[in-house]
Amino acid sequence: MEEEDESRGKTEESGEDRGDGPPDRDPTLSPSAFILRAIQQAVGSSLQGDLPNDKDGSRCHGLRWRRCRSPRSEPRSQESGGTDTATVLDMATDSFLAGLVSVLDPPDTWVPSRLDLRPGESEDMLELVAEVRIGDRDPIPLPVPSLLPRLRAWRTGKTVSPQSNSSRPTCARHLTLGTGDGGPAPPPAPSSASSSPSPSPSSSSPSPPPPPPPPAPPAPPAPRFDIYDPFHPTDEAYSPPPAPEQKYDPFEPTGSNPSSSAGTPSPEEEEEEEEEEEEEEEDEEEEEGLSQSISRISETLAGIYDDNSLSQDFPGDESPRPDAQPTQPTPAPGTPPQVDSTRADGAMRRRVFVVGTEAEACREGKVSVEVVTAGGAALPPPLLPPGDSEIEEGEIVQPEEEPRLALSLFRPGGRAARPTPAASATPTAQPLPQPPAPRAPEGDDFLSLHAESDGEGALQVDLGEPAPAPPAADSRWGGLDLRRKILTQRRERYRQRSPSPAPAPAPAAAAGPPTRKKSRRERKRSGEAKEAASSSSGTQPAPPAPASPWDSKKHRSRDRKPGSHASSSARRRSRSRSRSRSTRRRSRSTDRRRGGSRRSRSREKRRRRRRSASPPPATSSSSSSRRERHRGKHRDGGGSKKKKKRSRSRGEKRSGDGSEKAPAPAPPPSGSTSCGDRDSRRRGAVPPSIQDLTDHDLFAIKRTITVGRLDKSDPRGPSPAPASSPKREVLYDSEGLSGEERGGKSSQKDRRRSGAASSSSSSREKGSRRKALDGGDRDRDRDRDRDRDRSSKKARPPKESAPSSGPPPKPPVSSGSGSSSSSSSCSSRKVKLQSKVAVLIREGVSSTTPAKDAASAGLGSIGVKFSRDRESRSPFLKPDERAPTEMAKAAPGSTKPKKTKVKAKAGAKKTKGTKGKTKPSKTRKKVRSGGGSGGSGGQVSLKKSKADSCSQAAGTKGAEETSWSGEERAAKVPSTPPPKAAPPPPALTPDSQTVDSSCKTPEVSFLPEEATEEAGVRGGAEEEEEEEEEEEEEEEEEEQQPATTTATSTAAAAPSTAPSAGSTAGDSGAEDGPASRVSQLPTLPPPMPWNLPAGVDCTTSGVLALTALLFKMEEANLASRAKAQELIQATNQILSHRKPPSSLGMTPAPVPTSLGLPPGPSSYLLPGSLPLGGCGSTPPTPTGLAATSDKREGSSSSEGRGDTDKYLKKLHTQERAVEEVKLAIKPYYQKKDITKEEYKDILRKAVHKICHSKSGEINPVKVSNLVRAYVQRYRYFRKHGRKPGDPPGPPRPPKEPGPPDKGGPGLPLPPL
């Protein structure tokens, strides 16, 4: 029940916390959520919150300690509001509380000043109940009057306090979060054990066992450390001192960013961390109940916060609550000092405690939540030196006072503490007491985590900031520039992403905790995709509900107790979901950071895990075992591996440990998926809700996405469903968007996302591996597609509770999903980002943008994935990377793509369809691959899907199928039939329809003229298609089919029917050109699978949004058809010129594709001039497919991937050239020195000439001179009547002997 509450709270919390953070919400929030909020508030309030947490703790002592969340949520929330100071003071009566209260009071005052808290908000905030666990003492609930207010203030932007409270489980390792926040080391020593809120070390989880746990808590702290580390990164950014001892060390191997504060330590430290984690695991096993519950709580908190509803996500989890509690304290301290911006932002709401908790709540002193007031740092008191926590949670360690010190100490201290659980707390408290204090400073870490987690507030994530804010964060962020802070943190995170997983190992011991840690790390990753996190948290609430029994039992179950296996499983699942969401984000980042090899490794592992995860329980266990093994391997492996291991380890520990120690089978799969997700996330950080992203975030995300194919994976699926980790991947894109928006689909979305994330991770690594795995993967993908289709359809309807049914299919998907998902998710991610960034960004983004754009618009989750992501990024990717990426996409590209049922938008994104189509797609793709466009196929399909969806937004499947041209049917059907996906495709058909066939007919609607555009996109065409898409991004988010020969035909058919055009698969490239256009038969069904896989996933809304977007774009294109034509023709000319031989040599059909590149625009340009294709390849396909084919083929087919890179480069150059030429021509055109036709000709020729100049530079002066010469020449010809119908014709040949032909077909020819 608590989990449900939490779930509910989370959803609400994420929504409200983000926006308002009103206390009213608190009640709704599950206790967990409340606690998180309270914690956050406490954090926000600085450590003050911590104290309140303690107070709460007493109330929740037994229950709360174990199920802190439940009590914490509501009671705290309300209590806090009402009791605030009084409660704090009352509770303060407790021995240790008195000291804390003293500190607390100052924090109260402090909070307002620090957080600028909104009085109303803070008051409303539920009060954080912090269990003060002094050493062995029972937790003493500390009233945190200030907590709420501060949290509120902290959450100002968002209702952080509730989350904080909720997150801040009473126990919650107090927080390691606390550590981060309360990090204020000073208090830590005294309060370390008792450390206020829950002397998190001792009993964060188990309330009764606090005394014994104290030592154990230190062990958990290790996990906490790790967990905390994610926050540390931020803190580190804020306070360098901690950097040295970064908890992130485990992650450091990859060279996690020192800014990641936790991760900057040297690899050695990382290793130490890992060792510690292992030790912790052992310790945790000893204190499983306690430690693990604490860990879990912290993890849950981390996950929840990170996901924006940390508390909610894992509300059920103990972690959330404990985390929350610690967090709360953290915020409390942070608020004054740390709450700083994050807290002020309110984004910190969830992360503050998370940091401490996860990082090393217990170990660090657990009490990072020390409620050290600004001046109260001393408060540390005593606070119980009880050794349980280095810094009392309750203590408000003034981050400002010794935040840095504390931070540094904290990090090492946490470790030190780790060794001596009980004593450690004290020692830590003393030497490391600071660590918790640093926790406060580590607010940055919080922030990073928070930022990540802050899915909704996406960038608000800065709980960390709040924590470190006091000194570092404060000065740095001033608590104001959350966005900047988040970006910074994100960057740090990226750097330390690989390290971010480090905490996982320790948490591994406590399956729950690892989860949380993972969550936190994920959060970090999420930080980049805070939105995703936020979505995820919103989504996750439901899964956590099961954790309602959050008792020590639950904790224990997390701790691997079979008894509470089920609930733990549920909890874990939700956590996994959120985690996987965050993880995916984080993973992407990490992966990116780590580099290809690591990525591959991770992916492979993930993939393996995924496969094993497919079988939910049984495999889960094995998966866990495997993960554990991996963990060990990674640990042994060393820095590089460590990160990966950590990331995996986190999942493994989360899931593996859980499995090992009696984890719920389901959770382990979740964990595995989570791991995958994490990697995926690492890959890219595209928040689930782009709408929530700020420009900064978008920029960061876009940058990330553009930078590597890691982005490919879609962080978008906010949270993969924990339960069906296997399936998670597929729907994540669409589902994630949709689900997040719907909330009801959260589990499905989560699953999809998780699956997608893992899949994506896998896919990337599979890029190379995939070829080998293609056969198996294809089968799997096909199944997955099917599943996806089913699940997608189910999920699509927001109302449907498809998530449940979705999960079953998902497991199958999981196994093969990696490949399909990966391409899809990659695209998706980029798409989302781009869409928010710029729907019309013509680069590779263009295709992706629409889908994401729509999604981001919230139109629905348009999981439109365009291979274009890869393509668009290709220019930025290294050739090697790009080729594999494209290959990977090709193999998996078909998998996920489908916009799959554009018509059935509501229907699943057709991710399933993608799967169904996967096999054919793969087969075909393989064929295409052989043609050097293997990757293209999938992409084409995706693009096509989008185009279809746009043009046919809801077209009938029949029409779409019909769309498929006979040729495509012929060419494609053969391939397609093999895929069983055909059956699923039907549903997907609408989207799938075009997706598959080279997607040439991206948007049939646009196209009759644009058919060309889609015509021949093959491997190389793929890029050309990219260009098309860049130019006509929405025009056809046509996926370039790897062997997009059919692209041409598709393009032809596309005009007739968007789906049909897309349908023409690249297989029938040559025949497709004409046939596709001519016959858009219902052949689509067989190809359908192709389409789906390659196509873009579109949810109902997504489809609509996409359609609207495409149409808008089309209108714009039509409006500026002349421009588009010029550009396209110029591009085509250049491209044709560039790769005419290839194009012709490659495939006659593709030759038409020559125009394909510009096709997008070309199509627009050539509505009537389809003949445009006549160019030198096959006779102009009905729609100028010939030209498109020509160009595409030449560009893509022949030259293949390597060519693609070149092509993209040229394309970009071309685009710049076009801009320059246009600028130069404009004056003449305005003066009417030249006619429109001449203008176009000159533009085309000049661009061609410039692009083919030896220097390759675009010199405005030279461009101007060239244009002037052309203008004069045209004028001259006109005067001398030399300008026949096509003035450019004569001059053009002279000017550009070679290009004329191409140029002609490009632009003039169509008219001619």
Curated annotation (Swiss-Prot):
Q: Does the keyword Lyase apply?
A: no
InterPro entries (UniProt xref): SCAF1, SCAF11-like_C
Biased composition annotated in UniProt, kind: Gly residues: 929-938
Cite the record's Acidic residues compositional bias ranges.
Answer: 267-289, 1022-1040
Where is composition skewed (Pro residues) in this entry?
206-223, 430-439, 975-988, 1300-1312
Cross-link entry Glycyl lysine isopeptide (Lys-Gly) (interchain with G-Cter in SUMO2), positions: 865
Query: What's a BP term from Gene Ontology annotated to this protein?
Result: RNA splicing
Q: Which residues carry this modification: Phosphothreonine?
A: 335, 706, 976, 989, 1001
Name where it's found.
Nucleus
What top-level branch of life does the organism fall under?
Answer: Eukaryota
- Where on the chain is Phosphoserine found, per UniProt? 239, 448, 453, 498, 500, 526, 548, 612, 614, 719, 725, 734, 738, 872, 874, 929, 936, 963, 965, 992
Keyword annotations from UniProtKB, A to Z: Isopeptide bond, mRNA processing, mRNA splicing, Nucleus, Phosphoprotein, Repeat, RNA-binding, Ubl conjugation
- Which residue stretches does the UniProt record annotate as biased composition, category Polar residues? 158-169, 254-264, 991-1000
Query: What tissues contain this protein?
Result: Ubiquitous. Highly expressed in fetal brain and liver, poorly expressed in salivary gland, heart, skin and ovary. Expressed in colorectal carcinomas and ovarian cancers. Overexpressed in colorectal carcinomas as compared to normal colonic mucosa.
- A Pfam family (short name) is SCAF11-like_C
Q: What induces it?
A: Up-regulated by estrogens, androgens and glucocorticoids.
User: Could you give a GO molecular-function term held by this entry?
Assistant: RNA binding
Please give the residue positions where the record annotates the modification Phosphotyrosine: 732
Q: Where is the composition biased (Basic residues)?
A: 61-70, 485-496, 515-524, 570-587, 595-612, 627-648, 896-928
Q: Where is this region: Necessary for interaction with the CTD domain of POLR2A?
A: 1187-1312
One GO cellular-component annotation of the UniProt record comes to: nucleus
* Free-text function comment from the UniProt entry: May function in pre-mRNA splicing.
* Subunit-level organization: Interacts with POLR2A.
What family does the database annotate? Belongs to the splicing factor SR family.
Per its record, how is this protein called by name?
Answer: Splicing factor, arginine/serine-rich 19
Gene (UniProt): SCAF1
